[in-house]
Amino acid sequence: ALIFATLSAAYIGEALE
């Protein structure tokens, strides 16, 4: 769950930028 949340946050952050 932790790794999934981290990857999701990184993916979303990159998409927003």
From Swiss-Prot:
Topology class, membrane: Multi-pass membrane protein
Gene Ontology cellular component terms for the protein in this record: chloroplast thylakoid membrane; proton-transporting ATP synthase complex
Membrane spanning stretches: none
Example GO BP: ATP biosynthetic process
Localization: Plastid, Chloroplast thylakoid membrane
Protein keywords: ATP synthesis, CF(0), Chloroplast, Hydrogen ion transport, Ion transport, Membrane, Plastid, Thylakoid, Transmembrane, Transport
Keyword Thylakoid on entry: yes
Domain of life: Eukaryota
Record bears the keyword Chloroplast: yes
Primary residence: plastid
Family statement: Belongs to the ATPase A chain family.
Functional note: Key component of the proton channel; it plays a direct role in the translocation of protons across the membrane.
Subunit-level organization: F-type ATPases have 2 components, CF(1) - the catalytic core - and CF(0) - the membrane proton channel. CF(1) has five subunits: alpha(3), beta(3), gamma(1), delta(1), epsilon(1). CF(0) has four main subunits: a, b, b' and c.
This protein's name: ATP synthase subunit a, chloroplastic
Source organism of the structure: Diacronema lutheri
Upper classification of the organism: Eukaryota, Haptista, Haptophyta, Pavlovales, Pavlovaceae
Gene: atpI
